[in-house]
Regions:
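Compositionally biased, disordered extreme N-termini, encompassing classical targeting presequences
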Residues: 1-2, 75
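Generic beta-sheet signal
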Residues: 4, 47-50
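FMN-binding flavodoxin-like domain, especially the glycine-rich phosphate-binding loop
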Residues: 25-32, 47-48, 55-170
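N-terminal beta1-alpha1 ligand-phosphate binding loop
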Residues: 2-27
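Structured loop/turn residues at beta-strand edges in well-structured enzyme cores
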Residues: 2, 43, 111
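Short acidic low-complexity segments
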Residues: 32-43
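Structured loop/turn residues at secondary-structure junctions
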Residues: 10, 54-55
Length: 170
């Protein structure tokens, strides 16, 4: 059986959860899931999928480093990239063509993923430290999002994740 890889960068864990959900729909290959920071032997995979979350408007530096370091092997494989961010909760910003973070990312890198996905993430106010909690609350207030810091808000559209996964034909 062929092997596929999903490697991810996450701050609070939602991108890992989405990666695991994508792997559940694999019927043509076995899927390994590793953090992007792991030292991964990419050559043994037929397909490489990268998932990355946004925090304060940016992907983590490890995402850019991974892509730069591995662009040749990424280009030689079936590949995909998906972005996880809370702005994608808005219908006008939840596609690869309309999501500002994904658009900016693709302009900054040389790699051109063959498949793209954008998924809304999750806000876990009770889990956050004081500074993060109130910085995110302020951002949510500005963007007319939820601001009750006693609650968790999951915006991920799991049917959209399933559709993306099935289109990858893993």
């Amino acid at each position: 059986m062929e092997k596929s890889l999903i490697t991810y960068s996450t701050v609070d864990g939602q991108t890992k959860i989405i990666s695991e959900k994508i792997a559940q729909f694999a019927t043509q290959s076995s899927v390994d899931i590793f953090p992007i920071s792991d030292n991964i032997e990419l050559g043994k995979y037929k397909t490489i999928i990268i998932g990355a979350s946004i925090r304060y408007g940016k992907y983590r530096k490890e995402v850019y480093s991974f892509v730069e370091k591995n662009i040749e092997i990424l280009d030689s494989k079936e590949n995909a990239f998906f972005s996880v961010n809370v702005v994608a909760r808005k219908s006008e910003k939840n596609t690869p063509e309309t999501n500002p973070y994904l658009i900016k990312f693709l302009k900054k890198i040389k790699w051109k993923p063959k498949n793209l996905g954008v998924f809304a993430g999750k806000i876990e106010y009770p889990k956050y430290k004081f500074v993060d909690k109130y910085a995110i609350k302020f951002i949510m207030w500005i963007t007319k999002g939820p601001t009750d810091t006693s609650k968790t808000y999951e915006f991920t559209d799991w049917k959209k994740v399933e559709s993306f996964a099935k289109n990858l034909n893993l």
